[in-house]
Amino acid sequence: MFEGPLQDLIDELSRLPGVGPKSAQRIAFHLLNVDPDDITRLQDALGAVRDGVRFCRICCNISRDEVCRICNDSGRDRGLICVVEEPKDIQVIERTGEFRGRYHVLGGALDPLANVGPRELTISTLLQRIGGVLDDRELADSTPDTPLLDDKPQIHEVILATDPNTEGEATASYLARLLQDFPDLVVSRLASGMPLGGDLEFVDELTLSRALSGRLPL
């Protein structure tokens, strides 16, 4: 254990995903030895993210504006929604060049052990986009502070692109059951080729491209 600000820095770094105590210590000592201007740039970047990044009011993706670049793109199919867990998953799918619809970011996956239920995700916002009822008993108290949409295009298909692990599969199954209430809506899941137990973030572009092209109805 170190004393004072150094230990405080190590403790804060250890709270970051994927950063253990040893890695946090290495980062802290690295920061002690870098040029002060580098520290200032890091502080500025963190402040800019805190103050300048928000969530798109339509799809809940990260954005600098009220509506993100993808939702503002008139060349995309507004009736096709790909549901992902996190904003980083959008970047992976975009790199394939296969998908020309819009997205919806859940903000995670259902995980009872971590106390993540429907109320902690943007499921009610997704239903709102499709035209669902917002006073569903399971979701009535779950809505993040997302304004009502100004427009409601006719949604014809929802692709469930949650991670192919236990939590992602449970989330996809839950959403598929909810979306059965919309008889004209096609609900599909990414096709085979996705590794079970993995994260979408680490799937290569070719595998993901084939999965998108060969998606199957649920």
Curated annotation (Swiss-Prot):
Note whether DNA damage occurs among the keywords. Answer: yes
What keywords sit in the KW lines? DNA damage, DNA recombination, DNA repair, Metal-binding, Zinc, Zinc-finger
Q: Which family does the record assign? A: Belongs to the RecR family.
CDD domains to which the protein is assigned, alphabetical: TOPRIM_recR (cd01025)
Give a short account of what the protein does. Answer: May play a role in DNA repair. It seems to be involved in an RecBC-independent recombinational process of DNA repair. It may act with RecF and RecO.
One GO biological process this protein is involved in is: DNA repair
**Which SMART domains does the record cross-reference, listed alphabetically?**
HhH1, TOPRIM
The organism's place on the tree of life at top rank: Bacteria
Which segments constitute the Toprim domain?
A: 79-195
Alphabetized InterPro entries for the sequence: DNA_Rcmb_RecR, Hlx-hairpin-Hlx_DNA-bd_motif, Rcmb_RecR, Rcmb_RecR_Znf, TOPRIM_dom, TOPRIM_RecR
This protein's name: Recombination protein RecR
Signal sequence range = none
Map the zinc fingers (C4-type) to residue ranges.
Answer: 56-71
Record GO terms (molecular function): DNA binding; zinc ion binding
